[in-house]
């Protein structure tokens, strides 16, 4: 089977950019952890070799497991039974393979069990996973939600939740509601503090939540009584193991059916405040969505790569007038146009990732 990394020289090209010298030094803090962790690099060349080796593993899993499962995953889809989501069997295989390979929490610090990868390397992995199965990318890349806990959570929250993500726990960001889509400041899911239990309680409905039955949720909720704008919203962490959230239904979609898009009902669900009150939308969601936008860009590039390969394969095998249609100028022009746009968008993606790292 193909290795999506070693068979794609254009990906290796982006990892060898001159700015990687500076990016690695910043990410590794001048290799301060070289004596603390056995797998921490001791110099630039060692770090680059680590990235290469891990990306080769990602490429192998994509070629051997995720891509072959993609069609059956889309046919089978995720299902909802008794208020919970059950992934397609192929999705479970994909998750199991990446968990065993230690590819959850790739960008998280080593002290929590992560690989401490820079954004460029993580986007290279996301590019390949998206090419193999766009629906699985929706699930796997949500590990990046852990960045919000890392940036704004308390130290005990980081140690508890991020370490679980690095061991394979799934995540979701529960933002939109029936009457609050793009207009997130209208969100009404209610958060009230339970003095007796010493925790927050969440009540209400969330809709169109990707991977809505995940292990760990970041939830946008209204914590300030009487407010109507974004300044009354806070960010909370909900742990599925505490119960209190039911999946009412999975949305029917035209594609990416392996990724469950859920409607959730919160019924007095126990939650923890992440960061400070009132900053849920105006600070934390804004930071969260910046990372999400980059992930969706990587997904778009991966899908484009898969579409380009399908177009080339078809144009080479489909024959008309005694020759493959790729030899006809109009078709060759279309294929060349696809490739040009693909290369341009990929260049923008990795240039943006470099800016994020620096």
Q: Which residues are covered by each model-predicted region?
A:
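Amphipathic, small/basic residue-rich leader segments at the start of a protein or domain
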Residues: 1-136, 156, 160
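Conserved short loop/turn motifs at secondary-structure junctions
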Residues: 76-86, 109-115, 143-152, 175-180, ...
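Flexible, glycine/threonine-enriched loop-and-boundary segments that flank and lead into catalytic domains
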Residues: 81-96, 100-108, 172-201, 205-216
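Internal maturation/activation junctions in enzymes
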Residues: 141-142, 153-189, 198, 353, ...
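Short Gly/Pro-enriched turn/cap motifs at secondary-structure boundaries
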Residues: 179-182, 208-211, 227, 253-260
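A short core secondary-structure module
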Residues: 199, 203-245
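A glycine-rich, basic-preceded beta-loop-alpha segment at the flavin cofactor/substrate interface
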Residues: 241-244, 248, 253, 260-292, ...
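Extended amphipathic alpha-helical segments enriched in small hydrophobics
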Residues: 293-358
């Amino acid at each position: 089977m193909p290795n999506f990394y070693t068979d794609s020289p254009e990906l290796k090209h982006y990892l060898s950019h001159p700015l990687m010298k500076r990016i690695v030094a910043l990410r590794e803090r001048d290799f301060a952890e070289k004596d603390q962790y056995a797998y921490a690099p001791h110099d630039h060349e060692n770090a680059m070799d680590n990235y290469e080796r891990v990306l080769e593993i990602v490429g192998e899993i994509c070629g051997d497991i995720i891509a072959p499962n993609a069609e059956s995953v889309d046919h089978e889809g995720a299902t909802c039974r008794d208020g919970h989501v059950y992934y397609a069997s192929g999705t479970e295989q994909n998750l199991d393979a990446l968990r065993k390979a230690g590819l959850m929490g790739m960008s998280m610090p080593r002290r929590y069990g992560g690989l401490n990868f820079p954004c460029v390397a993580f986007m290279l992995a996301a590019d390949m996973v998206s090419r193999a199965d766009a629906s699985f990318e929706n699930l796997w890349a949500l590990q990046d939600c852990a960045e919000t806990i890392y940036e704004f959570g308390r130290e005990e929250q980081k140690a508890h939740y991020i370490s679980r993500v690095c061991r394979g726990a799934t995540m979701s960001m529960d933002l939109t509601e029936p009457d609050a889509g793009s207009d997130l400041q209208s969100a009404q899911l209610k958060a009230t503090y339970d003095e007796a239990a010493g925790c927050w309680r969440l009540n209400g409905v969330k809709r169109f939540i990707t991977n809505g039955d995940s292990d760990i949720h970041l939830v946008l909720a209204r914590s300030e009584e009487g407010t109507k704008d974004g300044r009354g919203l806070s960010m909370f962490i909900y742990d599925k193991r505490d119960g209190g959230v039911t999946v009412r239904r999975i949305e029917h979609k035209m594609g990416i059916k392996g990724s469950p898009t859920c409607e959730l009902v919160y019924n007095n669900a126990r939650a923890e405040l992440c960061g400070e009150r009132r900053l849920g939308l105006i600070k934390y969601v804004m930071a969260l969505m910046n990372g999400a936008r980059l992930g969706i860009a990587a997904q778009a590039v991966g899908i484009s790569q898969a579409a380009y390969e399908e177009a080339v394969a078809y144009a080479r095998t489909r024959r008309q007038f005694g020759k493959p249609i790729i030899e006809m100028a109009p078709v060759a022009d279309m294929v060349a146009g696809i490739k040009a746009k693909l290369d341009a968008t990929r260049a923008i993606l990795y240039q943006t990732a470099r800016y994020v790292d620096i």
